[in-house]
């Protein structure tokens, strides 16, 4: 059957049988009746068409009449007439005598001379009246063509301008020259010309008042143009006789007005559609039959109850393009749709109907706006109809079935009888509407991003359901809210946080689909789906809270999983039935409605708990006892560890015990060295010798001891050292981006957040007991834990500290991000990876390639082994927030976004119209932490000269290695990476001026840099310091501020602040600037000496080339 025959048959099927009129059949045949605008016939094209197009005139197409024979167009007749006239004139010329030719030629020359001086002014006058008439006609014309009957008074306007002048010249004594052709208008006395011009303006004004009153601005425009055209005729038509000048001017002016009025009467002038002609648009519509528009997902009106057991078999829409792994997982889901925990899923209960109706009312209000174009109105009507159909299929209903036992986040404990009367959470009003795209959540307020189900959820009420006992009652695996996608409003970033996604996790998905493979752990076997119950699929909670769960385990050796988890639930009812977390007792009563140990404010999942299990949970009193019991329970039930893993774990314990002793012995000496901004890290590496590979883990352990983070979050030393030992082993042995650089950045963020800051106001002076935040992102002071450094305290009340304004969880995330931020760095820039199509660049779409790779690789390492889980005592909300902060801090180190962060920070902290940093706002605190790690990442120029040159040597060597590889690959060598042509001093000075300097100045202007007060003498005229060194530092600081971007002035004070960081930055910048000036002087003198011949040592010539050059 051909395609046209199939289409015709389908279109015929749209007509219902006589007397039947079956609407369901007409709805499911794939076609729908509609109306469209017909195609408009193009007007005839030619010279006249282009003239009208230039004059903004739209030609109406001739009516289509196929029955009438084609006639000759008016343009054809005009061309024939002109041709006949030209032939007649040519015949007369050929028939005349030669003498008459000479007389005619002389007369023709005279005529051409007169016309050459007169045609241009006359044409200008005609055009002026033409465009004036078009303008006034457009402003006074009603809708539609041919409505400008009140504009014919404009024909009298040229007469008022010139005929009155003509009568004055004839009857009164004002001379207008001597009357012959050679007389020129300038011979007229000025007072006579001014009087005639005044008379012309009076006539025009009288015409405007009597004939057709206009607006004031239009009247002024007409008077100005009348005076202009009269002056043109008065000064430019001197070659014509005096009597012909006003007559011809009035005649051509009237012709221009007449032409404009004719065009407006017979044609339509285009103008902006201020009010769409809805009625005419509706009349031009023609009925058509078109294919029904379908989306790539199941229709919202096609509920699961009508999929089976009904005579309606809905048409299956086309599937999107998916990968092979996704297709396998989706196919498995389709086979499991009849499971009890799938019942009532996708019913739309998570949609707030009040919000949906509110949106529909807003669309209806938009439809009443007459200024909308027809296509927008049509789209809004379609949206309104879709929302109407969706609201009819999203009525909330109570699920009478017992939920299937799951392994997923706990929900609040509630009475099933109260479900029907309970209102939806206000936080879900605008964020719970389904959408085909995954949204991201920062996890800042406990909301969990729910994984969108990729299957078609169906519900067949005919299938018998399995009965479950009380002990198997747990959380919904895919409850009625599984289609909700929750978002956090007003978030600065869109990083995906690690969370318990509601939906089944398949075996091996975490490892086999992981984009980054760490070099420190082997591949994880994917296993098989055979003989696995849905509750066996691993979730993130397994790796975080059950150290015995290992992905490398064999499925054949696994115990009876349902029985095992049944034993767990029966033995300790205070454990979460889904993830094994404990229901912590410090959660307040106000939070019990919307938060829990795993999901926090994760929405209104209608989970049913029995009264017996609820009573058992209330009997637990001590949190420590519960955690010990849960760990013992997991250890007793764990039979998946192999002998090799057990022996390796024992070896790690012995190594860490000995390492702990070493760290305890060296803690005092190490923390003393770290208390200095110029941390002698290279001396420490040389002193450690063979143990220098442990510098990152030792410094990390020392900092956590100093700040008390180990005690606050109950971090186990064994897992802590296991992970950071593995993390530092993942850093490559390259000149700059190695474990020493990570340690230096870690020290810098610790120093910036724990050292005293002059003039900083502290908002907290004690420690809380919890780590929750309010729904609007503001902290609750009675529940937030803060840290303080044991090695340093504020000298007096005039000093403050960042650690007293930033919660402990956020500072711990900042420290961990500093240790992770260059993990597995290849020693190449982002630009190089993109240019060579490296796998990382392809994976991350050429955007922040290295930063995404560092974060993903470090977290992949953390999740690879249970003995790396040093955060096991964080609850789910805290871990989610922690992971989000770490990722955001690592991504902030991409210098391609440097100026975006700098502008945002200046607008928040240093703008005169800003309220400054609000420490109770989590977004402001996140911005401060991001700028802090950015400053720590490029702190080399702010160190003492020796350390600065050491770091410079490392980055230059690494960049030269990249330049060598680019040369070997035949690629153009990146700027400043060619060993043969170094431009070190110039680039270093530019890097400090444009990158490091503005960032440090902004951070200092915000009052966040550590320092100390310098007392100054009080004097009425001047302020001079007691110390000459302080004066010298002030002078250098002022010079630095002149060279770099000036920082906004803060409050005036008689005391000055000495900042060691800014002092070193000023010194280094001054030295590099002197080297640049010396080089320029040498070039001016023709000397080709290089920087190596200068008075500075060889190391002084090495330049810091930071990652800012990666994008050049």
Swiss-Prot record:
<dbReference type="GO" id="GO:0047555">
    <property type="term" value="F:3',5'-cyclic-GMP phosphodiesterase activity"/>
</dbReference>
<keyword id="KW-0140">cGMP</keyword>
<keyword id="KW-0460">Magnesium</keyword>
<feature type="transmembrane region" description="Helical">
    <location>
        <begin position="117"/>
        <end position="137"/>
    </location>
</feature>
<dbReference type="GO" id="GO:0007186">
    <property type="term" value="P:G protein-coupled receptor signaling pathway"/>
</dbReference>
<feature type="binding site">
    <location>
        <position position="741"/>
    </location>
    <ligand>
        <name>Mg(2+) 1</name>
    </ligand>
</feature>
<dbReference type="GO" id="GO:0046872">
    <property type="term" value="F:metal ion binding"/>
</dbReference>
<feature type="region of interest" description="Disordered">
    <location>
        <begin position="1092"/>
        <end position="1112"/>
    </location>
</feature>
<dbReference type="GO" id="GO:0007162">
    <property type="term" value="P:negative regulation of cell adhesion"/>
</dbReference>
<dbReference type="GO" id="GO:0005829">
    <property type="term" value="C:cytosol"/>
</dbReference>
<feature type="compositionally biased region" description="Acidic residues">
    <location>
        <begin position="1103"/>
        <end position="1112"/>
    </location>
</feature>
<comment type="similarity">
    <text>Belongs to the cyclic nucleotide phosphodiesterase family. PDE3 subfamily.</text>
</comment>
<feature type="transmembrane region" description="Helical">
    <location>
        <begin position="220"/>
        <end position="240"/>
    </location>
</feature>
<keyword id="KW-0812">Transmembrane</keyword>
<keyword id="KW-0479">Metal-binding</keyword>
<keyword id="KW-0378">Hydrolase</keyword>
<dbReference type="GO" id="GO:0033629">
    <property type="term" value="P:negative regulation of cell adhesion mediated by integrin"/>
</dbReference>
<dbReference type="GO" id="GO:0019933">
    <property type="term" value="P:cAMP-mediated signaling"/>
</dbReference>
<dbReference type="InterPro" id="IPR023174">
    <property type="entry name" value="PDEase_CS"/>
</dbReference>
<feature type="region of interest" description="Interaction with PIK3R6">
    <location>
        <begin position="436"/>
        <end position="460"/>
    </location>
</feature>
<dbReference type="GO" id="GO:0043422">
    <property type="term" value="F:protein kinase B binding"/>
</dbReference>
<feature type="binding site">
    <location>
        <position position="937"/>
    </location>
    <ligand>
        <name>AMP</name>
    </ligand>
</feature>
<feature type="transmembrane region" description="Helical">
    <location>
        <begin position="192"/>
        <end position="212"/>
    </location>
</feature>
<dbReference type="GO" id="GO:0016525">
    <property type="term" value="P:negative regulation of angiogenesis"/>
</dbReference>
<dbReference type="GO" id="GO:0016020">
    <property type="term" value="C:membrane"/>
</dbReference>
<feature type="binding site">
    <location>
        <position position="822"/>
    </location>
    <ligand>
        <name>Mg(2+) 1</name>
    </ligand>
</feature>
<comment type="subunit">
    <text>Homodimer. Interacts with PIK3CG; regulates PDE3B activity and thereby cAMP levels in cells. Interacts with RAPGEF3 and PIK3R6; form a signaling complex that regulates phosphatidylinositol 3-kinase gamma in angiogenesis. Interacts with ABHD15; this interaction regulates PDE3B's stability and expression and, thereby, impacts the antilipolytic action of insulin.</text>
</comment>
<keyword id="KW-0037">Angiogenesis</keyword>
<feature type="binding site">
    <location>
        <position position="988"/>
    </location>
    <ligand>
        <name>AMP</name>
    </ligand>
</feature>
<feature type="binding site">
    <location>
        <position position="822"/>
    </location>
    <ligand>
        <name>AMP</name>
    </ligand>
</feature>
<feature type="modified residue" description="Phosphoserine; by PKB/AKT1 or PKB/AKT2">
    <location>
        <position position="295"/>
    </location>
</feature>
<feature type="binding site">
    <location>
        <position position="737"/>
    </location>
    <ligand>
        <name>AMP</name>
    </ligand>
</feature>
<feature type="active site" description="Proton donor">
    <location>
        <position position="737"/>
    </location>
</feature>
<feature type="compositionally biased region" description="Basic and acidic residues">
    <location>
        <begin position="454"/>
        <end position="466"/>
    </location>
</feature>
<dbReference type="Pfam" id="PF00233">
    <property type="entry name" value="PDEase_I"/>
</dbReference>
<feature type="binding site">
    <location>
        <position position="937"/>
    </location>
    <ligand>
        <name>Mg(2+) 1</name>
    </ligand>
</feature>
<dbReference type="GO" id="GO:0004114">
    <property type="term" value="F:3',5'-cyclic-nucleotide phosphodiesterase activity"/>
</dbReference>
<dbReference type="GO" id="GO:0050995">
    <property type="term" value="P:negative regulation of lipid catabolic process"/>
</dbReference>
<keyword id="KW-0597">Phosphoprotein</keyword>
<comment type="function">
    <text>Cyclic nucleotide phosphodiesterase with a dual-specificity for the second messengers cAMP and cGMP, which are key regulators of many important physiological process. Regulates angiogenesis by inhibiting the cAMP-dependent guanine nucleotide exchange factor RAPGEF3 and downstream phosphatidylinositol 3-kinase gamma-mediated signaling. Controls cardiac contractility by reducing cAMP concentration in cardiocytes.</text>
</comment>
<dbReference type="GO" id="GO:0005794">
    <property type="term" value="C:Golgi apparatus"/>
</dbReference>
<dbReference type="GO" id="GO:0032869">
    <property type="term" value="P:cellular response to insulin stimulus"/>
</dbReference>
């Amino acid at each position: 059957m051909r395609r046209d025959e199939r289409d015709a048959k389908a279109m015929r099927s749209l007509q219902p049988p006589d007397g039947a009129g079956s609407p369901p059949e007409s709805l499911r045949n794939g076609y729908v009746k509609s109306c469209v605008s017909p195609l408009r016939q193009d007007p005839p094209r030619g010279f006249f068409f282009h003239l009208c197009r230039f004059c903004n005139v739209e030609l109406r197409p001739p009516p289509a009449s196929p029955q009438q024979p084609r006639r000759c167009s008016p343009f054809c007749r005009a061309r024939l007439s002109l041709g006949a006239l030209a032939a007649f004139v040519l015949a007369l010329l050929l028939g005349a005598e030669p003498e008459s030719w000479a007389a005619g030629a002389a007369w023709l020359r005279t005529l051409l001379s007169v016309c050459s001086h007169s045609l241009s002014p006359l044409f200008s006058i005609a055009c002026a009246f033409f465009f004036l008439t078009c303008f006034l006609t457009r402003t006074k014309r009603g809708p539609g063509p041919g409505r400008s009957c009140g504009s014919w008074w404009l024909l009298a306007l040229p007469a008022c301008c010139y005929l009155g002048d003509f009568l004055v010249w004839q009857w009164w004594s004002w001379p207008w020259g001597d009357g012959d052709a050679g007389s020129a208008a300038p011979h007229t006395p000025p007072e006579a010309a001014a009087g005639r011009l005044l008379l012309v303006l009076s006539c025009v004004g009288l015409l405007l008042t009597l004939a057709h009153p206009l607006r004031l601005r239009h009247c002024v425009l007409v008077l100005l143009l009348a005076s202009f055209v009269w002056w043109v005729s008065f000064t430019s038509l001197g070659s014509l006789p005096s009597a012909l000048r006003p007559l011809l001017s009035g005649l051509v002016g009237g012709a221009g007005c007449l032409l404009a009025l004719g065009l407006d009467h017979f044609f339509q002038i285009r103008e902006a559609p201020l009010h769409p002609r809805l009625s005419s648009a509706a009349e031009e519509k023609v009925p058509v039959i078109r294919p029904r528009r379908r989306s790539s997902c199941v229709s919202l009106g096609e509920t699961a109850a009508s999929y089976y057991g009904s005579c309606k078999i809905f048409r299956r829409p086309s599937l999107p393009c998916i990968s092979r792994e996704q297709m396998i997982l989706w196919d498995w889901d389709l086979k499991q749709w009849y499971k009890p925990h799938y019942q009532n899923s996708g019913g739309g209960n998570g949609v707030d109907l009040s919000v949906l109706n509110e949106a529909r009312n807003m669309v209806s209000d938009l439809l009443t706006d007459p200024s909308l174009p027809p296509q927008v109105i049509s789209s809004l009507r379609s949206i309104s109809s879709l929302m109407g159909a969706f609201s009819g299929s999203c009525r909330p209903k109570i699920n009478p079935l017992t939920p299937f036992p799951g392994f997923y986040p706990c929900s609040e404990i509630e009475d099933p009888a109260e479900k029907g009367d309970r209102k939806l959470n206000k936080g879900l009003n605008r964020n719970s509407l389904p959408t085909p795209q995954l949204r991201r959540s920062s996890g800042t307020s406990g909301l969990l991003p729910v994984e969108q189900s990729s299957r078609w959820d169906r519900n067949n009420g005919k299938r018998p359901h399995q009965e479950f006992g009380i002990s198997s009652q747990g959380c919904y695996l895919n409850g009625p809210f599984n289609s909700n996608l929750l978002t956090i409003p007003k978030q600065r970033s869109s990083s995906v946080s690690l969370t318990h996604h509601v939906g089944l996790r398949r075996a091996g998905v975490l490892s086999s689909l992981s984009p980054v493979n760490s070099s420190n752990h082997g591949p994880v076997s994917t296993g098989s789906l055979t003989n696995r119950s849905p509750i066996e699929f691993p979730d993130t909670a397994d790796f975080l809270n059950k150290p015995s769960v290992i992905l490398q385990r064999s499925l054949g050796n696994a115990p009876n999983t349902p029985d095992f988890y049944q034993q767990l639930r029966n033995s300790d009812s205070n454990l979460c039935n889904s993830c094994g977390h404990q229901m912590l007792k410090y959660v307040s009563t106000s939070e019990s409605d919307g938060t829990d140990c795993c999901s926090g404010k994760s929405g209104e999942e209608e989970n049913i708990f029995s009264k017996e299990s609820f009573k058992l949970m209330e009997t637990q009193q001590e949190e420590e006892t519960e955690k010990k019991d849960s760990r013992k329970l997991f250890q007793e039930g764990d039979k998946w560890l192999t002998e090799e893993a057990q022996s390796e774990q024992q070896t790690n314990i012995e190594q860490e015990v000995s390492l702990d002793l070493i760290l305890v012995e060296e803690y005092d000496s190490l923390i003393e060295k770290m208390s200095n901004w110029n941390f002698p890290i290279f001396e420490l590496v040389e002193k450690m010798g063979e143990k220098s590979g442990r510098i990152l883990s030792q410094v990390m352990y020392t900092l956590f001891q100093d700040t008390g983070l180990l005690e606050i979050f109950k971090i186990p030393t064994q897992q802590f050292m296991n992970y950071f030992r593995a993390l530092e082993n993942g850093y490559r042995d390259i000149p700059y981006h190695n474990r020493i650089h990570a340690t230096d950045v870690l020290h810098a963020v610790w120093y910036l957040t724990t050292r005293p800051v002059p003039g900083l106001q502290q908002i907290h002076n004690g420690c809380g007991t919890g780590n929750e935040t309010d729904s609007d992102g503001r902290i609750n002071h009675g529940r937030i834990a803060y840290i303080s450094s044991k090695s340093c305290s504020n000298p007096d009340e005039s000093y403050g500290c960042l650690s007293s304004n930033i919660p402990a969880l956020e500072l711990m995330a900042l420290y961990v991000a500093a240790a992770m931020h260059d993990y597995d760095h290849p020693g190449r820039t982002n630009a190089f990876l993109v240019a060579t199509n490296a796998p990382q660049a392809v994976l991350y779409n050429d955007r922040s390639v290295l930063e995404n790779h560092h974060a993903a690789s470090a977290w992949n390492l953390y999740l690879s082994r249970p003995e790396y889980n040093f955060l096991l005592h964080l609850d789910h909300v805290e871990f989610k927030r922690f992971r989000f902060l770490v990722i955001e801090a690592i991504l902030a180190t991409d210098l391609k976004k440097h100026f975006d962060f700098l502008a945002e920070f200046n607008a928040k902290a240093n703008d005169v119209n800003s309220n400054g940093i609000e420490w109770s706002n989590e977004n402001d605190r996140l911005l401060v932490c991001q700028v802090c790690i950015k400053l720590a990442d490029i702190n080399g120029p702010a160190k003492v000269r020796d350390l600065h040159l050491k770091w410079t040597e490392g980055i230059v060597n690494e960049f030269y290695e990249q330049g060598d590889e680019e040369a070997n690959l035949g690629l153009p060598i990146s700027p400043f990476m060619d060993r043969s042509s170094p431009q070190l001093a110039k680039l270093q000075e530019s890097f400090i001026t444009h990158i490091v300097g503005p960032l440090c100045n902004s951070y200092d202007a915000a009052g966040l840099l550590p320092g100390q007060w310098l007392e100054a003498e009080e004097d009425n005229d001047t302020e001079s310091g007691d110390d000459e060194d302080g004066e010298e530092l002030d002078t250098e600081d002022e010079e630095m501020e002149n060279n770099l971007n000036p920082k906004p002035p803060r409050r005036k004070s008689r005391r000055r602040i000495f900042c060691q960081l800014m002092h070193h930055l000023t010194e280094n910048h001054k030295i590099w600037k002197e080297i640049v000036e010396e080089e320029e002087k040498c070039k001016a003198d023709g000397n080709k000496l290089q920087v190596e011949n200068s008075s500075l040592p060889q190391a002084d010539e090495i330049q810091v080339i930071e990652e800012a050059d990666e994008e050049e």
